[in-house]
Amino acid sequence: MDADEGACDARGFAYGTAADEAREGLPACLAGFMRLCADGFAQGWHEANGGNLSYRMTPRDVDDFAPAFLPEGARGPWRPIETRGVTYALPRLAGSHLIVTGSGKFLRNVPTDPSANVGVIQIDPAGAAWRLVWGLVGGGSPSSELVTHLRGYDARLAAEDDCRVVYHAHCPNVVALSTLIRPDARTWTRMLWRSMTECVIVFPEGLGVAPWMVPGSPELADATRDLLRTHRVVVWSLHGIIAVGTSFDEAFGAVHTVEKTAGLYLAARAANGGAEPPRMVTDAQLRAVCDRYALTINEDMLDDGRPA
């Protein structure tokens, strides 16, 4: 078979294709999922099995994907939503279906073989268990950060945000910067806001920042859930970024903005002999941008003393 002819998995979906046209048989949500994985790998954010992605499907997505789901009797067993022995009930997610990257899977392989590297899971009516209904052909389980993703969705839904995507990437500039800057949200937010004008537009609420914690641990899931209640982007010190969005573009764009600006700040500081760059966006300019775009800036991140 020629490389550009593609193939089909056991459920009838095309993969291994060289042209987007060959993917017309894919549900749109899976095609978008695959593209984000490819874009993130192209940016250099996903070494080995680093990073993970999930998508909370809409009812239409489920209808489009349902013909490919495993028959009821062939679906995986119900498994508790748990990490390291700590279990969770998330009733806001009851009955949901999510596309999730697999544990130990390389995101670079998702576009060429989605059914082996990605799964669709269903949450039970109590929001306390999940089962596999498609994918992860050949064995495997959802990402080790599954609980962090699910609790992130729960936090955003509680904030009345129609969150559809949770994306975690190992962004090199952010990780490098976290070796130099203490894990303080105000410090990080001002540093990035003042380095590039676009930042306050993308995250006017500021950044959440978590200190180093064991990946996949209940502690990291708890801290991330708490921060995602009020932030769409959270820095994991010495680890990477996790971001949420109502679309693939929104989540990817947030990560891209933070990572690019971290690189700009590092370059400017290096060019200035390691000192803080002398010309940065002022608080008055930040306010002017937010006024122009009708955004509510997080007053706690400003130094100009003007009341909210």
Could you describe each region identified by the protein language model?
Residues D2-A308:
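Glycine-rich flexible loops
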